[in-house]
Each structure stands twice: as structure tokens, then as C-alpha cells.
Design a protein with these regions (language model features):
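N-terminal glycine-/serine-/threonine-rich beta1-alpha1-beta2 phosphate-ribose binding loop
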Residues: 1-102
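Hydrophobic residues in well-ordered beta-strands that form the structural core
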Residues: 106-107
Length: 107
């Protein structure tokens, strides 16, 4: 997850919490596990706050912070990434994710 702001709170947080508590099923594959394994952001403050507030609602995840947060996250080899940053910050993170060969969803 790249960006933990308003879009995360309104869209992705409820999704991840629901999938964790109720599961996700696809007829073609059976049960599908979708979890946050890492969050990349400038300061990590929102990710840390969410981790503290979500105890038991989702599995824990790593918070990557700083100017190279996306690169730190990509070093963990995620299956896919979602960029939910302000529009003017989509390109750089998205480019790095695609160049790493990771599936990408851009909000």
C-alpha cells in the first residue's frame, strides 16, 4: 500500500478489515487471502496509528517510511501494490512498482 490517507481510510481500510474477518472467495480459485504486508509513506505516522487502532482487525504489516519508502517496500517482493497517494504523486511510485514487475492498482 502506497499512501495511507483519506482514500485508504474510505476505501481500502474497510476492504482489508472485511476480508480479514469474513474472507474472500472466488469460485475459480477458492478462498483468496488479501492482506497488507507493507505500507509506504513519507512519515509512517498514519500507518503506525492504523496499526495501533486495528489490532485484531487485520494482521500486522511493516511500515516503510522516508523518501525511499516505495523502494524499501519493493525489496520485500509484494505480489501487488496499490498507489493511493494524491494524484500528483502517482507517477514516480507507479513507475518504480511496474519496473519491479509488481502488479499495480492506481487509485
Amino acid at each position: 500500500m502506497v499512501g495511507m490517507g483519506m482514500i485508504f481510510d474510505e476505501t481500502y481500510r474497510p476492504f482489508f478489515e472485511t476480508v480479514h474477518s469474513q474472507g474472500l472467495y472466488d469460485r475459480r480459485f477458492g478462498d483468496v487471502d488479501v492482506t497488507i504486508v507493507g505500507a509506504a509513506s513519507k512519515t509512517g505516522q498514519r500507518a503506525d496509528r492504523y496499526l495501533a487502532q486495528s489490532a485484531g482487525k487485520i494482521p500486522g504489516f511493516r511500515s516503510f517510511r522516508g523518501d525511499d519508502a516505495v523502494d524499501q517496500m519493493l525489496a520485500e517482493k509484494p505480489t501487488f501494490a496499490c498507489v493511493a497517494t494524491p494524484d500528483d504523486r502517482h507517477f514516480e511510485a507507479s513507475k518504480a512498482i511496474l519496473e519491479a514487475g509488481v502488479h499495480l492498482l492506481v487509485e
